[in-house]
Amino acid sequence: MIDLEFYKGKKVFITGHTGFKGSWLCEVLLMAEADVTGYALEAPTEPALFNILSLKDRMKSNIGDIRNLEYMKKCMDEAQPEIVIHMAAQPLVRESYKNPVYTYDVNVMGTVNVLECVRMTESVKSVINVTTDKVYKNKEWEWGYRENEELNGFDPYSNSKSCSELVTDSYKNSFFLERDIAVSTMRAGNVIGGGDFAADRIIPDCVRAAIKGEDIIIRNPHSVRPYQHVLEPVMAYLLVAQEQYKNHELAGNYNVGPNEENCLSTGDIASLFCAKWNEKSGNNIKWVNKWDGGPHEANYLKLDCSKIKQVFQWKPLISANKMLELTIEWYWKWINDFEKCSKEAKSQIVSNYL
C-alpha cells in the first residue's frame, strides 16, 4: 500500500488542485510533507474545499488555464517536479452537452499541453493522467469494464476523456519511453465526500436540499455507478505514482472503483444519505424520483479493478456505509462547527489510511 514517507520532500505538480478531488489530494500530500505546486483556475465553487482548508497559504498555487501552454510551462519549469498528477478538467456530463467545444478544448488540448510541459521538463519521472470510468464504450451490461475494453465515451465529456487517454498513449510512445518517464492513466468511478459543492452531483444536491428542508430530487434513481469515497482514488493515484517512480514497468492504465458489494444505484445512495442525515438531525427528509428530461447518461456502469489489485495489492478500504458516514460528518461540521472542517478532513485521512 501507499507509503507517505516516500513523498516527504518530493516535488509534486498537480493540475486541478483547486477542485474537490484536487483539494483532498493536496491535503494528503501536505500531511506527507511533500513540496506541492498547483496549477488550476480559481476554485470552481463557492464555498470551496480549497478555501476551507486554507490550501493557498500552505502550498505554491498558480492560477492559470491549462489551455495556456506558455504560462503552464513557466510554472512547471519553476517547480521542477518529479511527479505530475493531471486532474484539471471540465468534469460534468450535463455541462458538456451545453458547452461541447469548451469541454473538448479543456479535456483534450489541455491534456496535450500538460504532456507537452512534461516533455520539456527534465526533472519529471512519474506522471498520472486522471481520466474517468466513463471512457469506455458503454454497453449497459452488468459486468465491470476492464482496461482493455473499447474507449469511446458517448457524451462530449466522456468522449473527451477517451480522447485524453489516446493523447496520453501517443505522448508515451512518441516521447516518454525514450526518456524513461513512467506514465499511467487512471479511470476512477464517481466520488463522494465532504467538501464537494458542485452542481449536478448526488451528495451536494442532497446536502443543499437537506439544509433547506426540501425533498431531494433524483433524476435517475436506478442508474448504477461505481461510487466511492474521494480518498479511495486519491490514495490510488499516489500509490501508482509512487510505485511507477521506482519501477517504470508498472506504468499502464488502471481502473479504480469499489468492490462489487458496494456498487450502488443513485437511489441507494440517496436512501443511505436520508437515513443517516435524519438519524443525526432528527429531521425527516426524503428523496423523490423526478426525471427532468435531460440529455443521455449511461444507466449501468461498473469497473473491474482486478488489475490494480493484482499489480499493486491495492484494495478499497471504505465501505458504502462508511462512505456516507464520513461524508455526512464532514458536512455536519461545516454547517454546525465550521472551524473544525479542516481538522475533520485530516482526521478522516489519518483514521482510514495512516
Where are these regions (language model features)?
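C-terminal substrate-binding subdomain of Rossmann-fold SDR/epimerase-dehydratase oxidoreductases
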Residues: 31-38, 64, 190, 210-354
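Hydrophobic alpha-helix immediately C-terminal to the catalytic Tyr-X-X-X-Lys motif of short-chain
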Residues: 163, 167-171, 206, 269, ...
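Residue-level recognition of oxygen-bearing side chains
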Residues: 12, 71, 102, 109, ...
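N-terminal Rossmann-like NAD(P)+-binding domain of SDR-like oxidoreductases, especially those catalyzing
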Residues: 1-188, 298-299, 334, 344-353
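Flexible loop/cap residues within protein kinase catalytic domains
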Residues: 193
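Generic structural signal for small/hydrophobic residues in well-ordered secondary structure
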Residues: 7, 17-19, 84, 171, ...
